[in-house]
From Swiss-Prot:
It comes from the Archaea. This is DNA-directed RNA polymerase subunit Rpo11. Part of the RNA polymerase complex. One of its GO terms (biological process) is DNA-templated transcription. It comes from Thermoplasma acidophilum (strain ATCC 25905 / DSM 1728 / JCM 9062 / NBRC 15155 / AMRC-C165).
Length: 111
Protein backbone atom coordinates (compact mmCIF):
# COMPACT_ATOMS: atom_id res chain seq x y z
CA UNK A 1 0.00 0.00 0.00
CA UNK A 2 1.74 3.14 -1.18
CA UNK A 3 1.48 6.39 0.78
CA UNK A 4 -0.92 8.87 -0.79
CA UNK A 5 0.65 12.20 -1.70
CA UNK A 6 -2.26 14.57 -1.15
CA UNK A 7 -2.17 17.48 1.26
CA UNK A 8 -5.54 16.57 2.75
CA UNK A 9 -5.64 14.35 5.82
CA UNK A 10 -8.06 11.46 5.97
CA UNK A 11 -8.73 8.15 7.68
CA UNK A 12 -9.42 4.66 6.39
CA UNK A 13 -10.50 1.66 8.48
CA UNK A 14 -8.15 -1.22 7.61
CA UNK A 15 -9.72 -3.85 9.85
CA UNK A 16 -12.45 -4.01 12.47
CA UNK A 17 -13.15 -6.79 14.96
CA UNK A 18 -15.53 -6.85 17.91
CA UNK A 19 -12.94 -5.43 20.30
CA UNK A 20 -10.24 -3.99 18.01
CA UNK A 21 -9.78 -1.65 15.10
CA UNK A 22 -6.91 -0.62 12.82
CA UNK A 23 -7.14 2.74 11.07
CA UNK A 24 -4.82 4.14 8.41
CA UNK A 25 -3.99 7.78 9.16
CA UNK A 26 -3.35 9.46 5.81
CA UNK A 27 -1.13 12.55 5.99
CA UNK A 28 -0.94 12.70 9.78
CA UNK A 29 2.44 13.00 11.47
CA UNK A 30 3.95 11.06 14.36
CA UNK A 31 3.59 13.91 16.85
CA UNK A 32 -0.19 13.87 16.63
CA UNK A 33 -0.37 10.07 16.63
CA UNK A 34 1.84 9.73 19.69
CA UNK A 35 -0.35 12.23 21.58
CA UNK A 36 -3.53 10.45 20.46
CA UNK A 37 -2.25 7.02 21.53
CA UNK A 38 -1.18 8.41 24.93
CA UNK A 39 -4.68 9.80 25.45
CA UNK A 40 -6.35 6.56 24.32
CA UNK A 41 -4.24 4.59 26.80
CA UNK A 42 -5.61 6.69 29.68
CA UNK A 43 -9.04 5.12 29.04
CA UNK A 44 -9.83 2.29 31.51
CA UNK A 45 -11.72 0.41 28.79
CA UNK A 46 -8.63 0.22 26.55
CA UNK A 47 -6.44 -2.86 26.65
CA UNK A 48 -3.91 -1.81 24.01
CA UNK A 49 -3.27 1.17 21.75
CA UNK A 50 -0.34 1.82 19.46
CA UNK A 51 0.59 3.28 16.13
CA UNK A 52 3.09 2.02 13.63
CA UNK A 53 4.43 2.68 10.16
CA UNK A 54 5.32 -0.32 8.02
CA UNK A 55 7.68 1.71 5.82
CA UNK A 56 8.42 5.38 6.63
CA UNK A 57 8.63 6.51 3.00
CA UNK A 58 5.87 4.61 1.21
CA UNK A 59 3.29 3.79 3.91
CA UNK A 60 0.92 5.87 6.00
CA UNK A 61 0.90 5.34 9.77
CA UNK A 62 -1.76 3.08 11.25
CA UNK A 63 -3.30 3.19 14.69
CA UNK A 64 -4.41 0.01 16.44
CA UNK A 65 -6.78 -0.02 19.42
CA UNK A 66 -8.05 -3.03 21.39
CA UNK A 67 -10.58 -2.59 24.18
CA UNK A 68 -11.59 -4.67 27.20
CA UNK A 69 -15.19 -3.58 26.78
CA UNK A 70 -17.18 -1.31 24.51
CA UNK A 71 -16.34 -0.34 20.95
CA UNK A 72 -12.75 0.48 19.98
CA UNK A 73 -13.90 3.35 17.77
CA UNK A 74 -15.65 4.86 20.81
CA UNK A 75 -12.34 4.89 22.70
CA UNK A 76 -10.74 6.78 19.81
CA UNK A 77 -13.62 9.26 19.69
CA UNK A 78 -13.39 9.91 23.45
CA UNK A 79 -9.65 10.58 23.20
CA UNK A 80 -10.11 12.90 20.23
CA UNK A 81 -12.80 14.87 22.11
CA UNK A 82 -10.51 15.25 25.14
CA UNK A 83 -7.58 16.41 23.00
CA UNK A 84 -9.82 18.76 21.04
CA UNK A 85 -11.02 20.36 24.29
CA UNK A 86 -7.44 20.58 25.58
CA UNK A 87 -6.22 22.37 22.45
CA UNK A 88 -9.28 24.62 22.37
CA UNK A 89 -8.56 25.67 25.96
CA UNK A 90 -4.89 26.21 25.12
CA UNK A 91 -5.85 28.38 22.15
CA UNK A 92 -8.12 30.47 24.37
CA UNK A 93 -5.34 30.93 26.95
CA UNK A 94 -2.88 32.03 24.26
CA UNK A 95 -5.41 34.46 22.82
CA UNK A 96 -6.09 36.02 26.25
CA UNK A 97 -2.39 36.29 27.05
CA UNK A 98 -1.55 37.89 23.70
CA UNK A 99 -4.39 40.40 24.13
CA UNK A 100 -3.21 41.21 27.67
CA UNK A 101 0.37 41.60 26.47
CA UNK A 102 -0.60 43.86 23.57
CA UNK A 103 -2.87 45.93 25.82
CA UNK A 104 -0.11 46.37 28.43
CA UNK A 105 2.45 47.36 25.82
CA UNK A 106 0.10 49.77 24.04
CA UNK A 107 -0.50 51.63 27.30
CA UNK A 108 3.24 51.84 28.02
CA UNK A 109 3.97 53.05 24.48
CA UNK A 110 1.43 55.86 24.88
CA UNK A 111 2.75 57.03 28.28
Amino acid sequence: MQRERTAESSLRVISKEKNSITVEMINYDNTLLRTLVEEILKDDQVDEARYYIKHPVIDNPQIYVRVKSGKPQSAIKRAVRKLSKLYEDLGTQFQKEFQRYESDHMIKAVE
